[in-house]
Amino acid sequence: MNTLKICCIYIICLILIVTVCFPGKAQEADTLITSRIEEVTVDAVRTPDWKPVIKIDHRIIDNKDGVSIDELGNSLPSSKIQTNSRGESSIYIRGAGERQIMLFFDGVPLNTPWDNRIDLSLIPLEAVGEISVTRGIPSVTYGVNAISGVVNITSRTIDNSRYSGRFISRFGDNNSRYFSGMFSGGNNVLSYLVAGSHRTSEGFTLPGDFSHPDNPSNQRVNSGSDSFNLFSKVNYLYSRRGSLHISTLIIDSRKQVPPEIDVANPRYWRYPLWRRVGLAVSGKHTFRGTSASKIDYSISGTFLNAQIDQYKDSSFVEINDYENSKDIIFNGRAVYSGMISSTSFLRFVVAGFSTRHNEVILSEGNIARVYNQHCVSFGIEYEYFWKSISTLTGVSYDHSSIAVGDHNLLQNSIYDYSATAGIMYSINNSYSMNASVGRKTRFPTLRESFSGALGRFVANPDLKPETAYSMDAGFQGSHNRGRFDLIFFLTHLHDGIVRESLPEKKFRRINKDIIRTYGMELSYQNSMNDNISMLFRFTYLSALSKNEAGVFADTLEYKPQIMSSVYVLYSFRKNLESMMEINYTRKEYGLRHGIPSFEELPSYVLIHFRLGYTIGLSNKVSLEVFGRVNNIFDKLHYTQWGLPEAGRSFRGGASVEF
């Protein structure tokens, strides 16, 4: 609590000092720095707008100086990034796990169906232009399994009027290096974007007050990584009625997995291979005779090859087990939209995926095991808008089938449905209200049902789907220098899939009868003057499961009660800009290895600071030099028991943009 008080006093004093000593001035028109945080916006495009959509544009993304998506975690509403014992960085929104959330990159799913996860620490940032987040049960147009939210990541917009590019070099602690480049160009018919990066690091430094014989040095054991990424996109406008987009994403990585602290038999893992290659084709076409009837579509194919080497001990010399896996994934989605009257739209959607997972494990006799899953969703959605009211209702039929072995022996076939309904009412040009309800099912993944995770889990092929019943209501407002967003939410998750601790120091996934989650979210953004902007975000969350007595009293792991963040952006003078970020997390519980009961993680406050100076080399070329300190006070904190996070770290570098 003393740290929190110090943080609050510090930030208040900072605002007062800069307000008094550096009175705001109107910036010159050719200033290369934009000093306002304009991150929270409501999607006003004529697509389902029955829920507020929170957006993070490239200015916030650039100021994070990150190299991968996981470094943006605290910038997303009601979210936290958690690194698990496999070394994977995953996102949680409103306490919902990564398997309950779908991530899309330019409309193509990023989640790997084998476990419906994606390691965000391996997804590059250099081509990302905007991230938008829909919380709760989304539109049925997103297909299966998205029961708690959708994160849409879009690549940077191509300016067809000129060629543009950016080159970045960054350096940091533990011999961390990052180099990236991006170039785009074209004309009104054909345009392109190419981006690539290479990053390497020997690991991260632990906070100064951490001490444990399992990690005797200040550098985290086995925390290094190396990654090369390449993204390309071509846009073709073949007529006034249609466009075609082709993109590729290649990620070639190697990473180490820090072993858990104070665990009898931790994982001594390394990934000598993690390679993902994807090709996607998407487009839209407006039909003749009407400008309101169109089809949007995307199809993609992805190949993922990963290997885990398990070592005997912390010397990382002798390999005693390994797992090699290959995934082939096909995704598809088509949405037909038609205006059936001057005030209503009708949409038809078909979306789904087909995946094949092959794995070979040394301890299981090097026998190739094959798993197949096919999921499809057929949906219909009706949107009505009249004057200040917009409503939406949708239903879908969802199906999942799982087959095991080369002969596709059917293991199970599950059918279910999803339904959503929502309303948004604009009180005037500045204020609006919204409410929504929904039901949606998530099918168990192949890994949840059949994988032992190299001896860490006991498989449970009898897992049932989990079904979410959700509702939320909100109030939004805006003024000429900012806006706010207040939302209340409630979710009942039936047969929720959670893990339990077993006596033999293993885990098993089971279905909980009912999990209840409720809370509130508040976002407030304000540009105080042309020099100072701030963004405040606060989430209160209560998540409990029903016990045998029928009372909501059982604790759940890694669902923090309080999450809050503050961003303050200040321009001292032309081209000199600073940003301070404060993150606060409180009252979170987790299972420790071999202990059947939950234990509370320590609360923490993290403060980060950035300073950047931009030089205009010409009318079209700018150079920025920056420095950044993360976790200024070197705070020891955990997002999962046994896995301490990084202490104070430094990074700096330069970027050239033209």
For each feature predicted by the language model, list its residue ranges:
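Extracytoplasmic beta-strand/coil segments of soluble accessory domains associated
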Residues: 70-109, 129
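Periplasmic-side early beta-strands and strand-to-turn transitions of outer-membrane beta-barrels
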Residues: 160-162, 186-272
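Short strand-turn segments of transmembrane beta-barrel domains in outer membranes
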Residues: 150, 155-185, 196, 219-223
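Gram-negative outer-membrane beta-barrel transporters
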Residues: 385-390, 489-492, 511-592, 633
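Outer-membrane beta-barrel signature, preferentially recognizing the C-terminal barrel domain
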Residues: 263-286, 325, 409-413, 418-422, ...
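C-terminal beta-signal and adjacent terminal beta-strands/loops
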Residues: 204-207, 441, 492-494, 585-591, ...
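Short, acidic, small-residue-rich periplasmic hinge/interaction motif at the N-terminus
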Residues: 27-62, 98
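Short acidic/polar hinge/loop motifs at secondary-structure boundaries
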Residues: 108-136
